[in-house]
Amino acid sequence: MTAQIIDGKAIAQSIRTQLREKVTARKEAGQRVPGLAVILVGADPASQVYVGSKRKACEEVGFISRSYDLDTSYTEEALLALIDELNDDPTIDGILVQLPLPAHIEDSKVIERIRPDKDVDGFHPYNVGRLAQRIPVLRSCTPMGIMTLIKSTGVDTYGLDAVVVGASNIVGRPMTLELLLAGCTTTTCHRFTKNLEQKIRQADLVVVAVGKPGFIPGEWIKPGAIVIDVGINRLENGTLVGDVQYEVAAQNASFITPVPGGVGPMTIASLLENTLYAAEQYHD
């Protein structure tokens, strides 16, 4: 068996096209264009690339994009004050603060300062809690994008045995909640998990988000499983690889996401979807 590739790049492009059409329709109806504020503190190269991609995608769909590139020395107090301003700005529907933040700024304080109705990253405890209670509104972008990828396969998720490898607040934990909501029997694995191989070999659906190149051997993948590889790791020779050993996994899986071009584009597409949702549901 050779897996079908789940083309996140193409699916994300389709979403952006639909969003652009919706923005055009809003303008023609005399409605406001959605606005996204993107805040970057410091000069982390990877963060600069991510933020650049988000701003470009905003412009492509016709959103207003407001950029704040702040020096590493920017204080926590000043950042919270900026968030307060944007919370009160009626032209801004979404506020995104690129993580990680410098050591002197507490991530949780910043995340919780963003008003839940403008939390388009889906990180605020209110929005995570809504997902946990099965009434999601603004959902965490990467898991939301992954669910779109899984739906694109046409596979019925109800009753699937799913394994999530990684338990971060950004991907692993909300991913577990999304899969529960989709009717999966879900196991979350982390650094203390025993018998990881056994759990993965039994899984119909595997989502891996640990940030370690080739962490999951391809031969562990059950024949016919769906493999979602969230990892994006640059090797010394410059090659980008995922957390799963792709070549062997692709021989066992029924569907697999490539790296790059799988999950990454969907995270940004979901961010844009959340921004339009916030405009329509909360701010119109």
Curated annotation (Swiss-Prot):
Transmembrane segments: none annotated. InterPro entries: Aminoacid_DH-like_N_sf, NAD(P)-bd_dom_sf, THF_DH/CycHdrlase, THF_DH/CycHdrlase_cat_dom, THF_DH/CycHdrlase_CS, THF_DH/CycHdrlase_NAD-bd_dom. GO terms for cellular component: cytosol. Pathway: One-carbon metabolism; tetrahydrofolate interconversion. Disulfide bonds: none annotated. Its EC number is 1.5.1.5, 3.5.4.9. It holds the Pfam family THF_DHG_CYH_C. GO terms for molecular function: methenyltetrahydrofolate cyclohydrolase activity; methylenetetrahydrofolate dehydrogenase (NADP+) activity. The keyword Amino-acid biosynthesis applies. Homodimer. PANTHER family: C-1-TETRAHYDROFOLATE SYNTHASE, CYTOPLASMIC, C-1-TETRAHYDROFOLATE SYNTHASE, CYTOPLASMIC-RELATED. NCBIfam families: PRK10792.1, PRK14186.1. Belongs to the tetrahydrofolate dehydrogenase/cyclohydrolase family. This is Bifunctional protein FolD. It comes from Shewanella sp. (strain MR-7).
